[in-house]
Amino acid sequence: MAAGSAALIFSCASASAIESNYKASSTSSADTVWSKVGGFCGIANWHPAVAKCELSHGNKIRTLSLKGGGTIVERLLRWNNKGKNYTYMILSSPLPVTSYVSTIKVVAKGTGSEVGWTGKYKAKKGTSDADAKKVIDGIYKAGVDVLAQ
């Protein structure tokens, strides 16, 4: 059902979807960077905007408490430990986006690695595409830069 949910969101959002993509290189191995990612709630250990993460519903739902206030609730759609990536969707958040589906991925590059965060979403009513993209791009950059260190 989760994969079907992601497919439905992508098919509904594809005509006007906004895309964000941020990558950074690391001198650390892909295994080392992936270990920094941690589990689905590992984001609280590396993203500077996340104060706390709590798992529920069989570890498929995470609730992020943000350092500046606010809460984001996300559903894990796919976890691929061997492929060093996971995909999730936002269920509720104060962010200016809807229909949000995203993937965090780590790949080996020579003796180092590359960590990337990509997403597709729509701007909430009353928010320009450019403003929504600026917010998501900033979130991705802040997180990826920490993981790549």
Residue ranges: model-predicted function:
Residues P94, E114-G116, K120-Q149:
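A conserved amphipathic terminal alpha-helix motif
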Residues T32-V37, I43, R62, L76, ...:
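Hydrophobic pocket/interface hotspot
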Residues S28, T32-S35, G42-N45, T71, ...:
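Extracytoplasmic/secreted proteins, especially bacterial periplasmic and envelope-associated proteins
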Residues S20-Y22, A49, K60, I72, ...:
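Residue-level marker for the onset of beta-strands and adjacent loop->beta junctions
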Residues S28, H57-N59, G83, G110:
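Residue-level signal for tight coil/turn positions that link beta-strands
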Residues A2-S11:
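Bacterial N-terminal signal peptides
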Residues K67-E114, K120-K124:
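Hydrophobic-ligand binding "helix-grip"
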Residues F10-S56:
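Hydrophobic ligand-binding cavity/cleft-lining segments
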